[in-house]
Amino acid sequence: FLEAQSLKLTNVKVLMKSHTQVVVIGGGVVGCSVLYHLTKLGWKDAVLLERSELTSGSTWHAAGGMHTINGDPNVAKLQQYTIDLYQEIQEISGQDIGKHVTGGIMLAATKERFEWLKIIHARGRYLGLETEIISPKEAQKIMPLINPEHFVGALHDSIEGHLDPYSTTWAYAKAAKKQGGEIYQNVRVTDLQIHPQG
């Protein structure tokens, strides 16, 4: 449990609870996602503290790309989970996240790279990801700017795309609040003191 004495806070302009079960520090997309997932798991005593306003750190200028193709199968599965989650938070929060599914292609200019893409595809299929090995000519139909003569193959991910990181963060925040989470903005944490019992 958090005790008020264990955090030094500055800029506190709102009445805040003095004890809580968990505190998330930082109101970017990751912090708001953590708060959302805690409330989704049933944590009703969870608080997020943001030193300024939500998304005021690096989230507001993030690219917002969505990808499932990754060399690490665990990361690929996490990326797939997150893409599926976006619809959920949009529905719960009522916040449009500006999601655009465009599809994406990874190209192989060498046989070695193409073999690597085949391995990534096989791992992805095992994890339930819907990717497809395609020819350079098929890739050109999707991306007319490429010259198929320079490539030996490609990997297509139909659900790749992009979204608005600002709106996505607010969707997480609104969904978390609807599930009992609390968010305090303009609260700077300047010190943490760990109790001997942890």
Task: Give the label of every model feature segment.
Residues 35, 39, 175:
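Gly/Ala-rich phosphate-binding loop of Rossmann-like dinucleotide-binding domains
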Residues 39-59:
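Glycine-rich FAD pyrophosphate-binding loop
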Residues 64-142:
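Dinucleotide-binding Rossmann-like beta1-alpha1 core, especially the glycine-rich loop
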Residues 6-20:
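A short, basic/flexible loop-to-alpha-helix module at the beginning of a structural domain
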Residues 50, 135, 185-187:
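Short loop/edge segments at beta-strand edges and connector loops
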Residues 16-30, 47:
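Beta1/beta-strand and adjacent pyrophosphate-binding region of the FAD-binding site
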Residues 157-198:
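Helical element adjacent to the flavin cofactor pocket in flavoenzyme catalytic cores
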